[in-house]
């Protein structure tokens, strides 16, 4: 029996594989349960590293699911799942850190390319890299080839945004954290009745980099407090279930944490499609080659206009129910097609286990 350790799940105690874990919102941990089950079929036993340490078992390999300092263990290979960009996790752009691993699983097509002139690619050329798409979990209420709340009926929320109030950790024009805030502020000022914000951390302003950013943060926090107003008036609290919220919404702003990074496609667009909600997407530069363009609204069509959110709002407001259903139908067809399979939990497990066993 081959034994592997999981490093980076702060709860430890195999909580990563527990469907009843309080962190398992919308069953987001399913990919790791599938990974464990598929590993067992291949004679591999997976546990979080703390469990192995308590039982005195030395793993043959460790799989890092967060970018943490490498733990040296004799005769143990180490693999990294590089989930985030270096804008959010700066160490993911550190060649010295990446080169410590025996292999890196990543969606980053630039890093995966053998002919890229990218500096990080060249500095890590000797480290094996394996393609891995961000996994997406089908909600329990989702049924293949069916659309929940077809059309406008049952969708009392016009437009929503679900996400945590975070910021980039490196200055970079590609970050979209601040663009989310622009969208929120526009709707709050111009169409407050047609917008709702969900997620964590929105009772305070968005944090910013640098000294001037810190002063701006303090002012944006203090002034609403003194005036007895909410920092973000559209905030409705955390979404206990994204599917429950999105199945009641017509549109959802689905911006990645950063744009124009090839391969960087996370759960945001898929969460909306599962719920029959039309995504307003910005992020992966080649998204139309991955997800059919009739499934979503590409915000790049509006971004260079003089008033992008006004034009977007007019487009959304004038959309007929027939056109809305066409978006829903296109999303349904994509999710039922082979094109979605690379983004499933099963594909995630197979993409990891193949290289580990080779």
Model-derived features: positions:
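Conserved donor-nucleotide binding/catalytic region of nucleotide-linked donor-dependent transferases
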Residues: 317-334
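Short, hydrophobic alpha-helical segments
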Residues: 316-320, 352-358
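Nucleotide-sugar donor-binding catalytic core of glycosyltransferases
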Residues: 1-295, 336, 341, 345-356
